[in-house]
Amino acid sequence: MHCYAPDLYCHNIADVPFASLAKKNIVNICLDVDNTLAKRGSLLIDYQTVKALDKARQNGHIKNICIVSNIIWGRSREERVRKIAEQLAIEHYFAARFWERKPNAKPFLEAMRLMDSQPENTAIIGDQIFTDVVGGKRLGLFTILVRPLGEDHWTTRLTWRRHREIRILKHLGFE
């Protein structure tokens, strides 16, 4: 399969079929923060997202969740990741610094270590092909791409990543 092609493409986290994933023994979930769980820079998480994650956990479709975010630098950004994890009652999170950011292996390997999971039973849910999907594919994770919740970081706009992603999604038949 193409390294840019997500295994699943959903509108948002609430649309992810956690029951179907659990039937395939994919019960450990890595979650991106910016524009996946919350709009960039925000602490507000959509009610439908909270409800979907809670329901999946209560039904046993999710065993573990680890938030994996590229914070690049800054204590305030790491604090935001911690607060979001607390809101969702998520025990594990990894705030990747500049030199270890996604799509590098370290954030995913650390998340799997924290969840005591393996690639074959772990998924990554994120809004970017070049970080979340490519990084997950490199390690053999099940990759789920969701539409971004809000505006991109200036570096994403500067490098035209989102424009390239749209072209890739159209080429793959997702858009």
Predicted regions mapped to residue ranges:
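Active-site residues of response regulator receiver
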Residues: 32
